[in-house]
Amino acid sequence: MKLLLENWQEYLEEEISKIYYWQTRGPWKSESQIEFGVTHVPKATPRQRDRTEEIFEEVRKEKFPDRPSRLNCVYLCENLKGWEGKSFCSYPARNNSETYEVELRGDYNLFKTNAEYWTEAVMRGDEESARSYAEAYWEGAGEYVTSLEILVDPPEAAIIVEKYEE
């Protein structure tokens, strides 16, 4: 998905209200490209991840239709501290990934929740647990501790500010 950054200089001069972090899912393809999709959970089969996503989407549609869909959003975090060793920052498919600071612009739907609910649902592998975790996830329940996940729809609302340098 490509974002058009027509007035880049003007944009950089504007006051930035809130910075979020976004990470590519592999080698960077273009200066303004944002990718979106499902999260990775180590040691889970593709079938487990796919079925969990289906259940989470079913629960969202049934009980939380105002929330952004995990299937059509960009995933962000407010800060990178605590994400080291977690799915946002480190799994084999992201060894070549880069992290970027982004700003949200325009009309968008933002939802903050605890990413651990999704991870636990995948790891347990049964539909009853997945439904229970999905409800907690979409309620935004629990403490975020280190796993605050931010979903933003549409993905085009996340505009790259600059590459994050450690």
Predicted segments, located by residue:
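Short acidic, low-complexity intrinsically disordered linear motifs used
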Residues: M1-E15
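Charged/polar, solvent-exposed surface patches and flexible loops
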Residues: E10, E54-K61, G85-F88, A136
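Conserved NAD+-utilizing ADP-ribose enzyme module
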Residues: S17-K18, R25-R49, R70-N72, K81-E166
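Short aromatic-glycine-(Arg/Gly/Cys) micro-motifs in beta-strand/loop hairpins
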Residues: K43-P68
